Design a protein with these regions (language model features):
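N-terminal, positively charged regions that mediate nucleic acid binding
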Residues: 1-42, 46-60
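Structural motif
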Residues: 16-25, 112-119, 249-253
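Short, hydrophobic/amphipathic alpha-helical patches that form generic packing surfaces
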Residues: 25-34, 121-129, 260
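Short helix-coil junctions and helix-kink-helix linkers
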Residues: 44-48, 143-146, 276-281
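DNA-contacting interfaces and partner/effector-binding or oligomerization modules
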Residues: 47, 54, 58-202
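Extended mid-to-C-terminal alpha-helical interaction segments
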Residues: 191-291
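Gram-positive cell-envelope targeting signals
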Residues: 261, 304-314
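Short, Lys/Arg-enriched C-terminal cap helix and immediately downstream tail that follows
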Residues: 295-305
Length: 314
């Protein structure tokens, strides 16, 4: 089961467990607002989810309004249609919501959303009818779609009032209200009753953060290894040059000892090499010796080149 399907199923089951009449009505109102049409003709909701259609049927039935669910085969698959078309049921529906069906613009009636559970119920069925959530392994995104512009504005304000940090835009002529923040997506899922989906998202976020931390550390370690390898190679070349020129044995004992230890352990980091000495030496002290060896080698190379140039000009 996909993450979106899991969340949808949790929300649907929770919607069917509403106890207070005002909350059941708010849930039915959410369906009406986000249905395909809701006017004098009645109400029609089309969905690919049979459970959503059945939830709509049961919620309206609890409000005393009878509707029917039809299966309509389409090339892309079956579409489930919940409809309220019988004149008496249409009259009851509009009486339930205090509407006439002739409204020119649909906006949220705050009188139909009385308590906090009403808000949750309304947002939940809005999600069932016109919402989706992306798998958090890919990205954080939860959105609601509606063709009704004033409804979209009111719905954005409702989400903002409850600090879900919504945004609103238009896509292909449809109003889109979306939430992108991972914390807000988690909260709104839990608020709608998808507690397991919210917890799963939180766990996946923790795993993702751990992976990112490991990747950053690995990249840092790799960069440090590369830096260490380049530094070691530079020092080793300097020591080898001093050996070839017979200059190494003329140096102070501490420098000869440092050179010998580096040649015996060409891959060790400076910190690890310090521990090879008896007694151990400080990192700053050993670093100074290595830089001294490199400087001596460079100075010797420069003097040899100058002497060679003088010989050529004679």
């Amino acid at each position: 089961m996909s993450f979106a399907s899991q969340a949808r199923d949790e929300i649907a089951q929770r919607s069917l467990q509403l106890q207070k009449d005002c909350c059941v009505r708010a849930a039915a109102y959410g369906i009406a607002c986000f249905a395909k049409y809701f006017d004098a003709r009645g109400l029609v909701l089309q969905t690919e989810q049979e459970l959503t259609a059945r939830v709509a049927e049961q919620l309206f039935a609890r409000c005393g309004v009878q509707g029917t669910v039809l299966e309509k085969p389409r090339p892309s698959g079956v579409v489930y249609e919940f409809g309220i078309r019988e004149p008496e049921q249409v009259r009851r529906m509009h009486e339930l919501f205090g509407t006439t069906g002739s409204e020119t613009s649909l906006q949220i009636d705050p009188g139909l959303i009385r308590c906090q559970t009403c808000v949750s119920a309304y947002i939940s069925t809005a999600f069932l009818c016109g919402g989706t959530v992306t798998d958090p392994q890919k990205e954080y995104n939860l959105e609601f779609l509606t063709g009704r512009t004033n409804l979209a504005k009111d719905f954005e304000a409702l989400l903002a009032e409850h600090e879900f940090a919504p945004h609103r835009t238009r896509r292909n002529g449809v109003n889109l209200i979306y939430v992108k923040s991972s914390a807000s997506v988690e909260r709104i899922l839990a608020f709608m009753g998808a507690a397991e989906a919210s917890a799963q998202m939180n766990a996946q976020k923790a795993v993702k953060q751990l992976r990112n931390q490991i990747n950053r550390q690995t990249n840092c370690d790799t960069a440090n290894l590369g830096k260490t390898a380049r530094a070691n190679a530079q020092t080793t070349r300097a020591i080898r040059f001093l050996q070839e020129q017979g200059a190494l044995e003329t140096l102070p004992e501490v420098l000869q000892q440092a050179a010998a230890m580096r040649m015996e352990n060409p891959d060790l980091s400076l910190t690890a090499l310090c521990a090879c000495f008896e007694p151990p030496v400080s990192k700053s002290g050993l670093s100074h010796r290595m830089k001294k060896l490199e400087a001596l080698a460079e100075d010797l190379r420069r003097r040899l080149e100058e002497n060679a140039e003088k010989e050529e000009t004679k």
